[in-house]
Amino acid sequence: MNDDSSSSSSGDSSDGSSGTTIVQTNSYPWSAYGRWVVVIICIAALIFFFFIIGIINRRRTKKGQATIPFTNFYPLTAPPPYTAEPEARYNSTIHNPMPPMSQAYRPPPTEPPTVPAYETSSEFPPPAYPEAAATSDAAFRKYDGYAKLG
């Protein structure tokens, strides 16, 4: 006998299962309809509860009493009356801080300085930096302006 094995020695087969058959029972009838019966009973009880609360609240309002707090949900009653907000609140008038925008063009308050016209023979303006015009991307040198890395 090998004491290290976890299976029992009686009825061992080659696949490690014992010779007895285990039947797993499934409570299918309960899961098929029993749970739905409980759910339907709970939903019916909630509907009945809300209906009774609505009847009680309607009777209380007919007698002039206040309804049960947080239960004024009966659908056949009219919604509460809405009161209009007072026009001037805190005795102040509201002023629009910005004037309305118009669609007409308005020139800036001061004219910008005039720029001298380009020469008529040249199509393009002169370069902003003369050094940039002297070199191009094709003449890029390896360490121009860059630190040597590694």
Curated annotation (Swiss-Prot):
Residues 1-19 have a biased composition (Low complexity). GO terms for biological process: endocytosis; vesicle-mediated transport. Transmembrane segments: none annotated. Residues 1-21, 85-131 are annotated as: Disordered. GO terms for cellular component: Golgi apparatus; intracellular membrane-bounded organelle; plasma membrane. GO terms for molecular function: protein-membrane adaptor activity. Residues 106-115 have a biased composition (Pro residues). This is Uncharacterized protein C19C7.05.
